[in-house]
């Protein structure tokens, strides 16, 4: 039982408990990301494709993986896993020596998330599918959405390996 419950009420007690455990979960996430980064250093020749956008990420990822797997050993993020933590877990669990290409779906619910994913996987290729009004309630403006998706650009050194749509939808 939670001794403060009668004094502060259930809602505040839950909020208090959440504040107590939040740093623990954040530290655990950072540890998982660090382990994934270390594992990535063991694969210097791995080609990494990061796919972001408002729509079509999962479909494009699946189509690209299907086309490439006939000639290469390909690892891709499962289903619609597209967060830094989900990607880090996949790297730790599934990345093997024989993989030549890793295809990563990168989602964002706020600015900075695409950047953090790119810092983790260090992409060789970047794809932005369509930039639209998905998650407008979180980003507030289409400009903010566009800026979040464009965080991929500085990580692609060879701009011939960066694919961006000609217009937003």
How should each PLM-predicted stretch be described?
Residues 1-162, 166:
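Phosphate-binding loop of NTP-binding sites
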